[in-house]
């Protein structure tokens, strides 16, 4: 038996009766990947206006007596409606469909049928699957390549048929009807029961389908094929929009074009060239900046070596463009194995820099005999850190430094580096290093 939504895709509300209501759970996944389990009820109605997911088409949204329906799934000849409020069996209820979502799905699904038929008719390109996405839809074609000329020809043809206002009819055929063998289709579900539903675009295509469709191609308004992408092995994905999605896409594209025109100070026809020039300038600036940072790293390393406090524990604190300020901790005479160290040095902070910047400093100073704690990034936020020095000390201190800075890192061969989220706790790391040295001295 076809549901009301399949018999009349344009119906927006109707009255029916609750058959059953049982406790259930709904597993959801947000766009950010977060998963959630909702407690609620599966409600079965005598008939439904809400389409259950199937045939590549997502399910409808809507309400039952103003209670939101969060999911609709098919179970044999019945449709389960998930709600978070129970409904009493035998109660007469009013069902309303989210018409914007429904009509969008009708446009995309009928658009897919049309593109599939035309691609096959013009070039023998067979559709193997399709997906009705939230923003765009994808048709998988059984061909390793589809040329730009073929795409343009398909787009011209489908829009001509839309302008011809071709009717779209829905019929039901029995399983033993000879016509079943002549219609396009990818098989029936294992639990299918009853007649076969066939959607026909007059003079274009007949296709087995359970989905909701427009009654005339004119309701598609327009189809825009955005292009193709490489699909699975020997397959090509054709990306398209139909109907209102094309209008939204044009509105969004025009808004972006206006914004770029204002930012780039040129007309739309010059946007690409203007961006290329900006990219080239940016690459040159990045290259120059990298060279300057490398030179600065060498300069800082030499400045440390030449510091009057060399032999004690010193720090360099620099917030970016300002002058560096040096502070001496306390000169220490380190016993073996630390007596071989010429310095225990903490280069506390520089806002600008990267991992390479810190490693150049470590290489120039020579971390085999010097314990270095280097950081770059936001003084009170996130950044990068490097602990370098004798392997035994770094192996012991590295994970503890990472923990204090609430970061993640790894180390080998006398270097431990990583990302930190709490650069404001650098002073605690300095204290940790001092305590470690003091403890080693006491043990000696």
Swiss-Prot record:
Name of one Pfam family that matches: tRNA_SAD
Residue numbers carrying Phosphoserine: 174
UniProt-listed PROSITE patterns:
AA_TRNA_LIGASE_II_ALA
GO molecular function terms here?
alanine-tRNA ligase activity; ATP binding; metal ion binding; nucleic acid binding; Ser-tRNA(Ala) deacylase activity
Give the residue spans that cross the bilayer: none
Which coenzyme or cofactor does it need?
Zn(2+)
Family annotation (InterPro entries): Ala-tRNA-synth_IIc_core, Alanyl-tRNA_Editing_Enzymes, Thr/Ala-tRNA-synth_IIc_edit, Transl_B-barrel_sf, tRNA_SAD
Q: Does the keyword ATP-binding apply?
A: no
Gene Ontology biological process terms from the UniProt entry: alanyl-tRNA aminoacylation; regulation of translational fidelity
Q: Name one GO cellular component term.
A: cytoplasm
Localisation: Cytoplasm
Q: Chief location of this protein?
A: cytoplasm
Q: How is the cofactor bound?
A: Binds 1 zinc ion per subunit.
Sites binding Zn(2+) sit at 109, 113, 209, 213
Matches recorded under SMART domains: tRNA_SAD
Q: Which UniProt keywords apply?
A: Cytoplasm, Metal-binding, Phosphoprotein, Protein biosynthesis, Zinc
Function according to Swiss-Prot or TrEMBL: Functions in trans to edit the amino acid moiety from incorrectly charged tRNA(Ala).
Q: Which family does it belong to?
A: Belongs to the class-II aminoacyl-tRNA synthetase family. Alax-L subfamily.
The protein's name: Alanyl-tRNA editing protein Aarsd1
């Amino acid at each position: 038996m076809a549901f009301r939504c399949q018999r009349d895709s344009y119906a927006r509300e109707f009255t029916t009766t609750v058959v059953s209501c049982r406790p259930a759970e709904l597993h959801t996944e947000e766009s950010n990947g977060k998963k959630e389990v909702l407690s609620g009820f599966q409600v079965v109605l005598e008939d439904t206006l809400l389409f259950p997911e199937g045939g590549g088409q997502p399910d409808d949204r809507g309400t039952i007596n103003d209670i939101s329906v969060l999911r609709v799934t098919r179970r044999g000849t019945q449709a389960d409606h998930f709600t978070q409020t129970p409904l009493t069996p035998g109660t007469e209820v009013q069902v309303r469909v989210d018409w914007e979502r429904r009509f969008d799905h009708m446009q995309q699904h009928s658009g897919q049928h049309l593109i599939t038929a035309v691609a096959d008719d013009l070039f023998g390109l067979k559709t193997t699957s399709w997906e009705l996405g939230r923003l765009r839809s994808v048709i998988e074609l059984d061909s390793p390549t589809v040329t730009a000329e073929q795409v343009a020809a398909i787009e011209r043809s489908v829009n001509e048929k839309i302008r011809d206002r071709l009717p779209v009819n829905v019929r039901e055929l029995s399983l033993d009807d000879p016509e079943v063998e002549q219609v396009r289709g990818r098989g029936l579900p294992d639990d299918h029961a009853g007649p076969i539903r066939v959607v026909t675009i007059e003079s274009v295509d007949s296709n087995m389908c359970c989905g909701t469709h427009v009654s005339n191609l004119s309701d598609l308004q327009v189809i825009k094929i955005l292009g193709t992408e490489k699909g699975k092995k020997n397959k090509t994905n054709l990306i398209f929009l139909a109907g209102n999605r094309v209008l939204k896409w044009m509105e969004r594209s025009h808004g972006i074009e206006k914004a770029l025109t204002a930012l780039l100070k040129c007309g739309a026809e010059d946007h690409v060239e203007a961006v290329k020039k900006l990219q080239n300038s940016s690459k040159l600036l990045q290259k120059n900046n990298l060279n300057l940072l490398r030179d600065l790293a060498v300069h800082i390393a030499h400045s440390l070596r030449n510091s009057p406090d060399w032999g004690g524990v010193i720090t360099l604190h620099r917030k970016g463009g300002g002058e560096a300020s040096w502070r001496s901790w306390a000169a220490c005479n380190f016993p073996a194995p630390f007596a071989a160290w010429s310095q225990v040095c903490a280069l506390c902070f520089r806002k600008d820099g990267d991992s390479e910047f810190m490693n150049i400093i470590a290489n120039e100073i020579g971390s085999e005999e010097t314990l270095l704690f280097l950081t770059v990034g936001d003084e009170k936020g996130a950044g990068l850190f490097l602990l370098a020095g004798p392997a035994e000390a770094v192996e012991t201190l590295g994970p503890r430094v990472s923990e204090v800075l609430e970061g993640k890192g790894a180390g080998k061969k006398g270097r431990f580096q990583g990302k930190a989220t709490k650069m404001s706790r650098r002073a605690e790391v300095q204290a940790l290093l001092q305590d470690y040295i003091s403890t080693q001295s006491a043990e000696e």
